[in-house]
Amino acid sequence: AGFYGSAAWAAGRRKEQRILVLGDSLSAEYGLARGTGWVALLETRLQREKIAATVVNASVSGDTTPGGRSRLQVLLHKHQPTLVGIELGGNDALRGLPLANTRDNLAWMVEQSQATGARVLLVGMQMPPNYGADYARRFAALFEAVAKERKIPLVPFLLQGIADGPDPAALFQPDGIHPRAEAHPRMLDNV
């Protein structure tokens, strides 16, 4: 039910897709050569499969849900997407923003996207254990709650198989936060 599946389904109905990805550094190719991040790989995969789709990567390194919320209306109007992917929230947690605010911002962005007729995919994140088990659980649960309430698909953890894989250090840049280019095909498979 992710981007690829939705675009392939629509292609069968002969409708060109306009995919908007609103994310943070994990989607903005932070520290990578241009064209090697999962969003660029999505567009390449769709083209290879001859699925008519335009992918707009509106991701900004360091972005938070308040930042995404402030930019969303202009992006929806400008690009008129048929599919919207929201990959935000990780920086909210890293900055200590209240979880309730993150949840409310995500819900608002989903609602606004749905109001245009776009299908929405919510891309979740998880916090490392040093944030505490209770905080990590509540953080992951906010994505689940928004997806359930708005009846949209959820990718529970964009970095599944990367951050929790057998050798995560090998797949991350020296900062330990941003995946290397080698991890981005797996990230695409996750969405």
Short names for language-model regions:
Residues 41-44, 51, 67-191:
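Alpha-helical cap/lid subdomain in secreted, periplasmic
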Residues 9-61, 71-80:
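Serine-esterase "nucleophile elbow" of acetyl-processing enzymes
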Residues 5-7:
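N-terminal signal peptide c-region/cleavage motif recognized by signal peptidases
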Residues 1-3:
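N-terminal export leaders
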